[in-house]
């Protein structure tokens, strides 16, 4: 499981012109599930998202988590995080989990984040989304579930 975490001033997802999810200051997280990922990966990734200290404290040091600052989280499913571009000119997505499994795992990440008391908005699974992200910093980090070590 992979999560691309971005610190943002705001984020928003629209599908066919209608807003399906939006947040103020916090994190936009693109989440992809890979072959062989499971519930333990979802829990691990959610714990990292909730507790990574990537927001500044009074001294300007990254010392606070999204939970600490009262930020929100926008989770967007993103199978292209498993795109393999090593051969040819078209990415291969064979390492991405099948859609039903990916949906279950992305929903598990969202559920775990909510258990941590976070306000979580989401995109729409398997839809063509327009994602607006106003990065802050920018701060962008990749987290991989323990099963996805590569």
Curated annotation (Swiss-Prot):
A UniProt-annotated Pfam family: Tyr_Deacylase
Enzyme Commission identifier(s): 3.1.1.96
GO cellular component: cytoplasm
UniProt-recorded Gene Ontology molecular function terms: D-tyrosyl-tRNA(Tyr) deacylase activity; Gly-tRNA(Ala) deacylase activity; Ser(Gly)-tRNA(Ala) hydrolase activity; tRNA binding
Location(s) in or outside the cell: Cytoplasm
Keywords for this protein: Cytoplasm, Hydrolase, RNA-binding, tRNA-binding
Reaction equations catalysed: glycyl-tRNA(Ala) + H2O = tRNA(Ala) + glycine + H(+); a D-aminoacyl-tRNA + H2O = a tRNA + a D-alpha-amino acid + H(+)
Domain of life, source organism: Bacteria
Major localization class: cytoplasm
CDD domains xrefs: Dtyr_deacylase
Motif Gly-cisPro motif, important for rejection of L-amino acids per UniProt: ranges: 137-138
Function text: An aminoacyl-tRNA editing enzyme that deacylates mischarged D-aminoacyl-tRNAs. Also deacylates mischarged glycyl-tRNA(Ala), protecting cells against glycine mischarging by AlaRS. Acts via tRNA-based rather than protein-based catalysis; rejects L-amino acids rather than detecting D-amino acids in the active site. By recycling D-aminoacyl-tRNA to D-amino acids and free tRNA molecules, this enzyme counteracts the toxicity associated with the formation of D-aminoacyl-tRNA entities in vivo and helps enforce protein L-homochirality.
Record comment regarding domains: A Gly-cisPro motif from one monomer fits into the active site of the other monomer to allow specific chiral rejection of L-amino acids.
Subunit structure: Homodimer.
Protein name (record): D-aminoacyl-tRNA deacylase
Organism this protein belongs to: Heliobacterium modesticaldum (strain ATCC 51547 / Ice1)
């Amino acid at each position: 499981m992979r999560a691309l975490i971005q610190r943002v001033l705001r984020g928003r997802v629209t599908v066919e012109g209608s807003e399906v999810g939006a947040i103020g200051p916090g994190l936009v997280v693109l989440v992809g599930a890979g072959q062989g990922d499971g519930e333990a990966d979802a829990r691990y990734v959610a714990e990292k998202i909730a507790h990574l200290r990537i927001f500044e404290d009074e001294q300007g040091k990254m010392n606070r988590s999204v939970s600490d600052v009262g930020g929100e989280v926008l989770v967007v499913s993103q199978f292209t995080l498993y795109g393999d571009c090593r051969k040819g000119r078209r990415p291969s997505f064979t390492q991405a989990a099948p859609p039903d499994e990916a949906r279950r795992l992305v929903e598990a990440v969202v559920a775990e984040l909510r258990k941590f008391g976070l306000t979580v908005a989401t995109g729409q699974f398997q839809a063509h989304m327009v994602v607006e992200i106003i990065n802050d910093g920018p701060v962008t980090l990749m987290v991989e579930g323990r099963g996805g070590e590569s």
